[in-house]
Amino acid sequence: MKKQAITVISTALTCFLLSNVGHAQEKPKQYYTVLLKDPSKFEQGITEIKKENGEITYTVPEIGLIQFKGDTQISKNQSPLFESVNPSLQVEKPEVPHSIKMPNLSTLSTKTLDTNLPPLWDMQWDMKEITHNGESYKKETGSHNVVVGIIDSGVDVDHPDLVKNLIPGSKNFVPKGGLRGTEPEETGDINNINDINGHGTLVSGSIAANGELKGVAPDTGIRAYRVFGNKSADAAWVINAIIEAAKDDVDVINLSLGSYYVNGKVYENGKLVDNGWAEVEGYKRAIEYANQHGSVVVASAGNDSVNVANKQELNNFLKQKYEKEGKIFTGVGIEAPGELPGVVTVSSTGPTGQRSVFSNYGEGVIDISAPGGDYRLWQQYGEEVWWNTGLFRQEEVLTTFNTGRYLFAAGTSMAVPKVSATLALIINHYNFKNQPKRSISHLYKNGIKKDIAPDKASLGNGQLDVYNAIK
């Protein structure tokens, strides 16, 4: 069972705005998040915040979440409407490790004999493994009747491998001015889903590429829900995107992101930072909302090689992270949204079938694993040999990238979309639309390798097998 009683303070992957001691006129206004006890009292909550001179900056009325800017933090005790109040949390923008622009395809030496498979197929060790060398495509490739919503940095709308499956209805959640007004290039246009970062395009290719590359579900519809510009995102944007994707009748919601939180207290410069769990409770409410509206939510386990089920190990990891930031904490850490109820949590494996060296793990946390690449060869031979001899092609996964390019990358972010795409195939193949529990149960029972007894801490219910999921 996944942990459900959560208090959020801060995280190594999440930025935290802390209030400072001093006179109000001597410090800039800070951003705070309020979660209401009863979302139906949303307008009353807005009124209460404005009474305290709070400037409303972002809202998610469906779950009673409000972000405001103010001189001082409002205590949750100031109103019986407030469940929690804390400095607003940010989710750091996802990192894109490096891009490799592939050579002209006509110069590639390829052994691909099946004319139904694309020219770069021989470089897709991950897809060959989970599709039984493309056999799953003969059974099911998906349709636009089933949609995967990708909450990320947007998508390259002109990428030739993706354009056929990018269906209408994508949305931008980065507001005008971007993060706290620091991105003047962000206009707040709801239709701006252009991927500046590139991470969302990487994820999209693993799901629905259908060109020089092939994704798991090459005829499945995708929508981009853009929450990252050039900088980090407020967690409220991600929460809002989950809600909106569910309202848009998205079948599978892909979250190739995650952060660390603490159930306890955090101190900075000897000062106690008030406890708060608005964003984590907001995530929980949004995920429950999505499940109730028929959407499956899939999230990554994280990339720090930590046993997140072992709270002592996780706490030691977070302690080291916090010390670098001049902070100390007491309490218990958690990875979210991966550890939250109602989420399919994915770890990463490499070409050997072992858990990737970077992947988080933990029995009772990991639900399933999928190929996301590895760095064992990099560790064995060193970076120079790994690059110069092309060893990276043997363990990183190839996917789509911005401006029509392709990229070799690794991370749990590359494992999650394969599971999301497989769920989309299951929903389409078995007509499981609006039946998230049934779809997930089928995945865990059938969509895994049958000949391998899984290490539950690393692989959960097992290693993803797309062919088995739909045969």
Segment roles from a protein language model:
Residues 33, 67, 147-151, 205, ...:
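Structural recognition of the beta-strand scaffold that forms the well-ordered cores
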Residues 18-28:
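Sec-dependent signal peptide cleavage junction
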Residues 24, 32-122, 351-354, 361:
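Autoinhibitory propeptides
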Residues 1-5:
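Positively charged n-region of N-terminal signal peptides that target proteins for export
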Residues 114-206, 210-218, 237-240, 247-248, ...:
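Active-site core segment of subtilase-fold serine proteases
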Residues 250-257, 261, 428-471:
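C-terminal subdomain of the subtilisin-like protease fold in secreted/lumenal serine endopeptidases
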Residues 138-143, 214, 233-255, 277-300, ...:
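Mature extracellular/periplasmic domains of secretome proteins
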Residues 322-424:
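Extracellular S/T/G-rich loop segment that most often corresponds to the catalytic His/Ser-adjacent loop
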